[in-house]
UniProtKB/Swiss-Prot annotation:
Residues 331-343, 371-386, 487-498 have a biased composition (Polar residues). The lineage of its organism: Eukaryota, Metazoa, Chordata, Craniata, Vertebrata. Residues 391-405 have a biased composition (Low complexity). Ubiquitous. This is TRAF3-interacting protein 1.
């Protein structure tokens, strides 16, 4: 991302909006939520694109679906193209996916220019809401015959590419068993083909466009389109091409997903088969047989490698394994003779009893293995393994008939040899699935049955998730250790045929007196009990057993001289218990005292501080009371001085009121007297008039 583009965006939009912040980090790869906030802020601040979105779309929480985001951005792009008249190459789907930050910044720059130039967007909003797509004004319609032919050719090629991709997807699903290298090569070739076709299309379109332009220039110069319209046409073409490529990539991704699902199913089936085989082998004691078989294979490698892959396939198809039987029988007999001559007389004497037991165990384990092989008809095995199995079956049948002529001797392998065997088996298990086809027969037939599923397993594609962690299988070692708990010898898996007579066998072996069965059983029982106690008992059980032993010792009958001592000890223990209880009580009381002393001391400290504060406050209030009392007295003196003349005036007024009241009373008395006189005079006049 160029820093100059971000700077231009900051200059254009920084004058229009203040938030969200136009930082270089956000503008270099703008997320949709950031673009949504910018557009809503532009609408709120300037009114540009007002009415384009509903109230629900203005809230970013409602625009979470991919289609909703694409439609949101498409509306904004259409309005900006209509208002500005400039072509925009930004694709909403690419913007939502986080691609094309430069074109996204170009969109933001044009929005800022429209807002700064105060261009009206009402007409464009109306047209976009009516369903019209954003196009540059004055764009000439491409109605020439050459352009139509180009479009037809493009459509035909698109249909061919679509059919080819579908056919390829079907073929890839059918051929999912091929190796990763071949698939990668085929996919590279198939990816190159549509690219080359796209290049041819672009060249053909450019040639057709050039011819068309030259013809138009010669026919009519007035119809010449401006540069911006040509750029818009190119942008639309590129947009169509991008959409086509997206569709193709989506189809390919869908096909790849189907392939991955099928591969995962095959892998799960192989894993389940491998687990079932492991369980059967653990049950039947086949792990020890596999270890011995791997040791035997190390001797058989040069002879088995000489057999060609064609002969092996013929043997497998026809079912004739006579040559392999003969070879395995001869190898078994030679190995048995070598092992018999190299054994010492001491080991023979020690294993004389154990060998008889182990003969039965080996026969049983081989029978179980044969039954397990018959139960798995779909299991793929190499010719060498089949030959050894048949040889073992023949040897078991011979051992049933001639049990006296068969002997098995075992030597306990060293731990270094065990580690080597494990490491080699792990290495073979890891190197199994590396680039092998089904049609090819493996050169090393020593691969065990566990690896047959790994060979048939399809390699993981590069786009797959990381594989789960591998669990290290230690079942074989655990099974061996459980089998060897009674004795330190392993059970031999090869039952050799001896064509010699009984006398020759007696000459080869040195027979010694075997220990009695009762002694052997006692030794085995003691070792088994000790092992079980060591393995089963944990720390708690051991402590319980120790306490039980101590208790049993205490319950034994005491001696006569120890009675007094025991009484003294019991009395001493009682006194000790009483003293310890009193000490414990004292300790608890001291602890409670200490616990209460600390908060008490803190309270006392706080009380002292509070008392000082209260005394200071009391003095303050006393002084304030004194001041207020003095002020009150001063005010009283002032009021007294001011009220004295008023009091004198009041006294005068009261005196005047009394005088006036006296005058009124005197006037009333005169009026009453005059009325009496008038009445008397009227009465006297009436009397005189009557006369």
């Amino acid at each position: 991302m160029n820093a100059a583009v971000v700077r231009r965006t900051q200059e254009a939009l920084g004058k229009v909006i203040r938030r969200p912040p136009l930082t270089e980090k956000l503008l270099s790869k703008p997320p949709f939520r950031y673009l949504h906030d910018i557009i809503t802020e532009v609408i709120r601040m300037t009114g540009f694109m007002k009415g384009l979105y509903t109230d629900a779309e203005m809230k970013s929480d409602n625009v979470k679906d991919k289609d909703a985001k694409i439609s949101f951005l498409q509306k904004a792009i259409d309005v900006v193209v209509m208002v500005s008249g400039e072509p925009l190459l930004a694709k909403p789907a690419r913007i939502v996916a986080g691609h094309e930050p430069e074109r996204t910044n170009e969109l933001l720059q044009i929005i800022g220019k429209c807002c700064l130039n105060k261009l009206s967007s009402d007409d464009a909003v109306r047209r976009v809401l009516a369903g019209e797509k954003g196009e540059v004004k004055g764009r000439a319609s491409l109605t020439s015959r050459s352009q139509e032919l180009d479009n037809k050719n493009v459509r035909e090629e698109e249909s061919r590419v679509h059919k080819n991709t579908e056919d390829r997807g079907d073929a890839e699903i059918k051929e999912r068993s091929t190796s990763r290298d071949r698939k990668q090569k085929e996919e590279l070739k198939e990816d190159r083909k549509p690219r080359e076709k796209d290049k041819d299309k672009e060249k053909a379109k450019e040639n057709g466009g050039n011819r068309h332009r030259e013809g138009e220039r010669e026919r009519a110069k007035a119809r010449a389109r401006p540069d911006n319209e040509r750029q818009k046409d190119r942008g639309n073409r590129e947009r169509d091409r991008d959409s086509e490529r997206k569709k193709e990539t989506e189809r390919k991704s869908e096909g790849g997903k189907e392939k991955e699902r099928l591969r995962d199913r095959d892998r799960e089936r192989d894993r389940d088969k491998g687990k079932d085989r492991d369980r059967r082998r653990v049950k039947n004691g086949e792990h020890s047989w596999d270890l011995d078989r791997e040791k035997n294979r190390e001797h058989d490698k040069p002879e088995k490698k000489s057999a060609s892959s064609g002969e092996m396939s013929k043997k497998l198809s026809d079912g004739t394994f006579k040559d392999s039987k003969a070879e395995t029988e001869t190898e078994i007999s030679t190995r048995a003779s070598k092992s018999l001559t190299t054994k010492t007389s001491k080991r023979r004497s020690k294993n004389s009893v154990e060998g008889r037991k182990e003969d039965n165990i080996s026969a049983k384990s081989l029978d179980s293995i044969v039954s397990g092989i018959n139960n798995e008809p779909n299991q793929e095995t190499t010719t060498s393994e089949i030959g050894t199995k048949e040889a073992n079956i023949n040897s078991t049948s011979i051992s049933d008939d001639n049990s006296a002529s068969l002997r098995c001797e075992n030597i306990q392998p060293n731990p270094t040899e065990k580690q080597k065997g494990d490491s080699t088996s792990d290495a073979e298990g890891d190197a199994g699935p590396a680039g092998q086809d089904k049609s090819e027969v493996p050169e090393t037939p020593e691969i065990p049955n566990e690896l047959s599923s790994n060979i048939r397993r399809i390699p993981r594609p590069g786009s797959a998730r990381p594989a789960p962690p591998r669990v290290k299988r230690q079942d074989s070692m655990e099974a061996l250790q459980m089998d060897r708990s009674g004795s330190g010898k392993t059970v031999s898996n090869v039952i050799t045929e001896s064509h010699n007579s009984d006398n020759e066998e007696d000459d080869q072996f040195v027979v010694e007196a075997a220990p009695q069965l009762s002694e052997m059983s006692e030794i085995e029982m003691v070792t088994a009990v000790e092992l079980e106690e060591e393995e089963k008992h944990g720390g708690l059980v051991k402590k319980i057993l120790e306490t039980k032993k101590d208790y049993e010792k205490l319950q034994q009958s005491p001696k006569p001289g120890e009675k007094e001592r025991s009484l003294f000890e019991s009395a001493w223990k009682k006194e000790k218990d009483i003293v310890s209880k009193e000490i414990e009580k004292l300790r608890t009381s001291i602890q409670t005292l200490c616990k209460s002393a600390l908060p008490l001391g803190k309270i006392m400290d706080y009380i002292q501080e509070d008392v000082d504060a209260m005394q200071n406050e009391l003095q303050m209030w006393h002084s304030e009371n004194r001041q207020h009392a003095e002020a009150l007295q001063q005010e009283q003196r002032i009021t007294d001085c001011a009220v004295e003349p008023l009091k004198a005036e009041l006294a005068e007024l009261e005196q005047l009121i009394k005088d006036q009241q006296d005058k009124i009373c005197a006037v009333k008395a005169n009026i009453l007297k005059n009325e009496e006189k008038i009445q008397k005079m009227v009465y006297s006049i009436n009397l005189t008039s009557r006369r």
